[in-house]
Structures are given as C-alpha cells and as structure tokens.
C-alpha cells in the first residue's frame, strides 16, 4: 500500500454511506451495460458491484479526499463496449486493490443531449465530455481538485495499469509543484515509431 494514497477502508466506508444517502432503493449490478439505467454508478469493491447512487440533481462531485477514476459511457457507443472488456476485468482484478481510489461510471445514451438522468447529463456538460469513452482522473483534496487528467478513447488493460495505477504518484507529484507528464497513449507511441521510420526512409532516398 502506498503510504500517501489514502485509506481504502475509510473510502469504502464513505462510499457505502454515500450510496445509502443518495438513493432509497439502490440498483446494484455486476457490470454497467447498455440496458442499465442512466445515471451515476460507484464501484463497491467489497461486494464487487456497481451501485447506481444518483439519477437526479446536480453533476457528480467528489465527496471525499482521494483519487477518482470516472468512465463516461454511452450506451450507443461501440468503442465503449470494446472498452468494457478491459475496464471491468481491470477494476475487478487490479483496480479494487488500489488504496484511496474511487471508481465511477457516468452513463447516458448519447452524451448530455440524449440522457434519461439529469445528474449524468449535467456531469457530461460540467466535465466537458465530447468523446466516448472518456476516462477522467481526478485528485480531490479538501474540497478542491488538485490535479486531473482526461484520456479520450478506448484504453487497453496495459494502458489502464499505467494511466490509472500510477495516477496516485503523478497527482502527488503535481501537488508538490513538480512537473508532471501524463503517460503517452499506445497510439501515440505507434505514431512516433511510424514517423521515425518514415524519416529514416526519407533520409535514405
């Protein structure tokens, strides 16, 4: 356990209290999918379930100090269904073990304009989400967002390990005022390799 990444037991306790506070009858699912009600889901690591905690009201706000990983999901998004195949196994097998992390899914049909959940729609608008899937990472402390990253598009499981797993360290580094460079995406690495090859070929001609 990273000594500075928060108390996972305390986070779980707050999550459990929050789910009770925000919804009288909590919808719980093993995985959020195309037939799931639109709204804001929080992962309950203890029971390996996603709890629908909010459908009405304002946009999602971090509710305690910690590291938030928010997946903006659209039911009409084919890339989201591909992402699900890496996202859910990663959370279940690896993400749930990360101390101080809170995993969230915000589900609509098609962004803010086609959504049966007021809270989810407002969340898409507030966080300026225009691509799906989008994974937003937030470090929240003392009522403020200290550091955040937005990753648009499908992430592989290896990318999730790098981007999510090490977010804690990048966020704490940013808090100390140190320069932080978010990890490059796989496609960016592939483009760099391709450009280098093209430059090498151009130099030989």
Question: What is the predicted role of each segment?
Answer:
Residues 60-76:
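Short active-site neighborhood of thiol/selenol oxidoreductases, capturing the structured segment around
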């Amino acid at each position: 356990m990273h000594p500075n990444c928060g108390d996972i037991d305390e986070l779980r306790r707050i999550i459990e209290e929050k789910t009770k506070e925000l919804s009288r009858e909590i919808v719980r699912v093993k995985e959020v999918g195309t037939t799931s009600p639109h709204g804001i889901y929080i992962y309950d690591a203890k029971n390996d379930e996603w709890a629908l905690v909010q459908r009405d009201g304002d946009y999602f706000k971090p509710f305690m100090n910690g590291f938030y990983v928010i997946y903006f999901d659209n039911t009409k998004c084919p890339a989201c269904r591909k992402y699900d195949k890496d996202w859910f196994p990663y959370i279940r097998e690896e993400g749930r073990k990360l101390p101080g992390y809170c995993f969230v899914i915000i589900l609509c049909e098609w962004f803010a304009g086609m959504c049966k959940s007021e809270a989810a729609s407002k969340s898409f608008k507030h966080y300026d989400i225009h691509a799906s899937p989008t994974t937003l990472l937030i470090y929240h402390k003392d009522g403020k967002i200290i550091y955040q990253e937005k990753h648009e598009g499908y992430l592989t499981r290896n990318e999730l390990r790098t981007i999510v797993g090490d977010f804690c360290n990048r966020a704490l580094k940013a808090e100390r005022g140190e320069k932080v460079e978010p990890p490059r995406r796989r496609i960016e690495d592939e483009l760099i390799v391709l450009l280098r090859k093209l430059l090498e070929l151009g130099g030989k001609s």
